Regions:
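Conserved active-site tyrosine of GNAT-family acetyltransferases
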Residues: 15-19, 85, 114
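Charge-dense, helix-prone N-terminal extensions
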Residues: 21, 25, 81-89, 93
Length: 125
């Protein structure tokens, strides 16, 4: 259903480096973009995450209650993505752990611009 989700950033180069390094863990890469937007995914036919300098050139803001959940593929990958994000300068918004017994495992961070991300594994690992 979703084609892509966009997060506004304050420093495009810094954010691009953050997401490129972070997503290398789950074999997700830069699939398209230009000088103000970069889209990450496996290809343009699958859901992507975009980062951009807002088109109106006003300051971006992280939404209260807004979060992007990234399917990690395993609990170990959730842990690895979380650790990598923290090492790259993200802040903890909920350490890795089981949130719904035997079904949902997640780890939460705020990226360099305060956008909330969840690295998750749903179902059996």
């Amino acid at each position: 259903m979703l084609a892509y989700t966009t997060l506004g950033v304050t420093d495009f180069e810094r954010a691009n480096a953050f997401y490129a390094s972070l997503f290398s863990i789950i074999d997700v890469g830069h699939v398209m973009g230009n000088e103000r937007i970069a889209l990450y995914g496996t290809d343009v036919q699958n859901p992507m995450l975009a980062i951009c300098i807002p088109y109106d050139e006003k300051a971006p803001s992280a939404g209260n209650g807004t979060m992007v959940a990234i399917r990690a593929g395993s609990r170990a990958a959730c842990d690895e993505l979380y650790a990598k994000a923290i090492a790259l300068g993200a802040t903890c918004d909920g350490p890795p752990g089981e949130r719904v017994p035997d079904f949902f495992y997640g780890a939460y961070v705020r990226d360099l611009d305060g956008n909330k991300l969840c690295f998750c594994q749903m179902g059996a690992n």
